[in-house]
Amino acid sequence: MALKERLGTVVSDKMDKTVVVAVVNRFPHSIYQKTVSRTTRYKAHDEENNCKVGDRVRITETRPLSATKRWSVAEVLRTTKQEKEAVK
């Protein structure tokens, strides 16, 4: 069985070794065909506390690590610092 992966943005890093990642899912409405966006928040394990708010990350499914934590940060795709430099 392949592990599920999601791409998202870190919205909270206030917990120790845990970040909250918001993943946006876009799909057409079943009747009106308008594109609808749904945001799901996942708690993900961050062993070294590397992630900061605003970072783009890839998370992968893992065994249950706590009551609500079933995802782990696989890699940081883009940091907040890199995004600020790209805008300039």
From Swiss-Prot:
Its cellular-component GO annotations read: cytosolic small ribosomal subunit
Kindly name one Pfam family recorded for this protein. Ribosomal_S17
Keyword list (alphabetical) reads: Ribonucleoprotein, Ribosomal protein, RNA-binding, rRNA-binding
Q: Per the UniProt entry, what are the Gene Ontology biological process annotations, in alphabetical order? A: translation
UniProt-listed CDD domains: Ribosomal_uS17
| Gene Ontology terms, MF aspect | rRNA binding; structural constituent of ribosome
Which family does the UniProt entry place this protein in?
Belongs to the universal ribosomal protein uS17 family.
PANTHER family (alphabetical): 40S RIBOSOMAL PROTEIN S11 FAMILY MEMBER (PTHR10744), SMALL RIBOSOMAL SUBUNIT PROTEIN US17M (PTHR10744:SF1)
- HAMAP family linked to this entry: Ribosomal_uS17_B (MF_01345_B)
Give the quaternary structure: Part of the 30S ribosomal subunit.
The job of this chain, per UniProt, is described as:
One of the primary rRNA binding proteins, it binds specifically to the 5'-end of 16S ribosomal RNA.
**Name assigned to this protein:** Small ribosomal subunit protein uS17
